[in-house]
A protein has these predicted regions:
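ATPase nucleotide-binding head domains, primarily ABC-like/P-loop NTPase cores
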Residues: 28, 35-253
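Long, non-coiled-coil amphipathic alpha-helical linker/lever segments
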Residues: 1-26, 128, 132, 144
Length: 253
């Protein structure tokens, strides 16, 4: 036994790596077996391509899932998504992120078809403060954005997802910072999606129409009930529901 250990112990890490790859590939094969309608993505040689038909979040049951087409092509492209609370903005960003990770790992994705460039995915979503690290919410957001910006400035092919960025500060500073960051990002080959309630950001489509496109999710009020169709539509959102939600819980507005 000692002779065997002496001879082969140096190979143990290689064996574990192969076993890990087999487990990962087995998991992907299991996904394909159980979800035959999922597509294997085609990997693009050119940078900046993320195209999908009927893309959805796989953790939502098929009977409840609303899928959407998505297209982001070209360096510096930013899709700005607006919409009322609970309309599906954050869930859609999560769907983009998880499917991008799955697809580039070699797995089928929850979509009818998909084409991807070999992006590196970076996100600023659900950022929180930290008592242990003495970080306020706003500074934690800045630290996350700093990491993303540094990678982009190095010229790497990045796809980013920014959900309600800079929400930890006042409205004026948030708008100024978000507008400045987006104007900076379009100058690099990274592309991504920004979800926001701030309609001021949608004006960038007029300023940079070849780089920035507006999309939105809708919400509807029927009687005292809120309704959502979770369908991604072109253009900026024209209706919001925050006041209706406040009234619903008893705030007299």
């Amino acid at each position: 036994l000692e002779r065997w250990k002496s001879r082969f112990s140096g190979d143990a890490m290689g064996w574990l790596q192969v076993l890990g790859e087999v487990e990962a590939l087995s998991s992907f094969a299991n996904l394909h077996f159980n979800f035959r309608d999922w597509a294997f993505p085609e990997i693009e040689e050119e940078s900046g391509v993320f195209r999908a038909e009927a893309l959805g979040h796989f953790l939502i049951p098929p009977e409840d899932r609303i899928s959407n087409d998505f297209l982001a092509e070209g360096r510096g492209t930013i899709l700005v998504i607006t919409g009322p609370n609970m309309a599906g903005k954050s869930t859609f960003l999560k769907a983009l992120g998880v499917n991008l990770v799955l697809g580039l790992a070699g797995s089928p994705v929850c979509a009818r078809s998909c084409r991807l460039s070999p992006f590196k995915l970076y996100t600023s979503m659900k950022v929180s403060d930290s008592l242990d690290k003495h970080l306020s919410l706003f500074y934690a957001e800045l630290q996350r954005l700093k990491v993303i910006l540094e990678v982009i400035l190095r010229g790497e092919d990045v796809f980013y997802l920014l959900d309600e960025m800079l929400k930890g500060t006042n409205a004026l500073d948030r708008q100024a910072g978000a507008l400045a960051l987006m104007r900076q990002l379009v100058g690099f080959k990274a592309s991504g999606v920004v979800a926001t309630h701030d309609l001021e950001l949608t004006r960038l489509e007029e300023e940079l129409p070849e780089k920035i496109k507006n999309f939105h999710f809708d919400g509807f009020v029927e009687g005292d009930q809120l309704r959502f169709d979770y369908i991604l539509k072109p253009g900026k959102c024209e209706s919001f529901n925050a006041l209706a939600l406040m009234r619903k819980i008893g705030i007299k507005i």
